[in-house]
From Swiss-Prot:
Protein name per the record: Ookinete surface protein PIMMS43
Membrane-spanning ranges: 485-505
Sequence segments annotated as region (Disordered): 188-221
Keyword Hydrolase among record annotations: no
Lineage: superkingdom: Eukaryota
Organism lineage: Eukaryota, Sar, Alveolata, Apicomplexa, Aconoidasida
Encoding gene (name): PIMMS43
Subcellular location: Membrane
Topology within the bilayer: Single-pass membrane protein
Quaternary structure note: Monomer. May form multimers with an unknown protein(s).
Organism of provenance: Plasmodium falciparum (isolate 3D7)
Amino acid sequence: MQKRIYVSLFFLVFFLSKISVVLSKDDGQRHGEDSDSMNKYNYIYRPNADNGIHNNLRPSSYIDMEHIAKGRDNTSGLRENELFDIQNDENSNMGPDQEKVITLSDKIYIDKIKNIIEYRKWRAKSKYRSPAKQPEEDMFVEGYIPIKRRDDNLLPHEKAEKDFEEIIQKYVDLENKLQKQKELEEAERRKKKLDDEQKRQKDLEDTNRKENDEEQSYKKLEDLELENIDTKINNNDTYDVENGFNDDNKLYTKINKIVSQVSQNNELYVNIMKYITLVYTSHVDIKQDDFTNGSISIFLTFENPKMGNDLANINISFFASEQRTGTNEVAEARSNYLTNYNMNELLEDNASGRLLSQDEYIKELVKYNHSISSSNKENLKNENYDVNMNISKILQYIIDNDINLVDNFITFNRTNEQEVTISKLDDFLHECSKVKPEDIKKDEIQKIIKTINKKEQIIKEVKNSLIKKDIEKCKLYTTILMFGSSIYSSIKYFFLLMLFVIYIL
């Protein structure tokens, strides 16, 4: 019995395979003659299809039909993003006389394919597409032809990403440009700083070299002067005129006359050197054991005032050398005082061409000494310095020039801070002795005499009035001497004594 059932089922299946229910004439063509096309479709869109049998083309529920109308089929496993190229199979392999019968399956199949194609065309044109899997090609179709990706056909997020990358690249390029410019500016700044430093070093070297050259020239000049002085001392020469390159007897004669005239008034210039030497020795003790040698040089250079330069340059150079205690080293120091003098003013002061007299020279010397002493007092802060300088200089001048102390003793009367007048002692005594009778007040004189019983006190008061240049007191005590004593008869002796006392002071 069981064998019979199996045989019956076999013949049934065989019969159905030979005599199938054909719903349309193109079913056989679709699954027989055009099976390759259907297999291609099933391979692409229906991988789960069963050898071309329309298992997935049966009528579906309303939800499935809605999905199909929207281009989606959840049951078919349709891949929307794959490239496809579907030929219209409904008219393929049909003869001209063959009748076309549209079945329900064909209707569903055709509507589904049309909806899918329309949906994909709309998606291809829409800007809200999903990104393609391959970056070099667009996975959508436009008229069944694959289209390449274009910049104007990018998706919104891709375009925004590309714009962002372009902006970032611009910022990167700008940053690189600014960094390069900054490096160039830094290199230029360093180069300028290096050039400035080199220039400063060069200027400093030039200045030092110039100072060294000047110092060497001064030292050579000083050595020549010392050598010349030593030669003159050895030869016992009073003056000398050095020969130049071009012989000019007339010019030599003029220079010889100048030297001769200066040598005849040697005391005038010696006193100037004495003053400068006194200033020098007030700061440098030349009697110390470590002192070796020193020098004072005075240079006066000038040109023809008509050439436009009417200034005479005065250079006073001071030099000192000392031996280091306990060593073989020698310390040397040099300093120069540079100034200038207007030659036109000098020529105007000496327009007559004559030399100053002794009195005129003394007057100028006192003015100069007062100005120098004032400056030294400010610099040295020594209140006795200028006083000692004045007394020493005046007494030295009196001794060197053999001035008669009786006839020519001079006194200095300071009229203001800048001028000092000179008067002889006999002029002051003559003025002091001018006493009129009506000026004598006997009562006052008697009162003073009672307080001063000794003549030594009267003489002391007279001396103080002479020293202080108090003409009123001098007249008063001179009158006392004339009125109440015989000392007045020997007043000349008294004044000589006063001169001696003043000189001793």
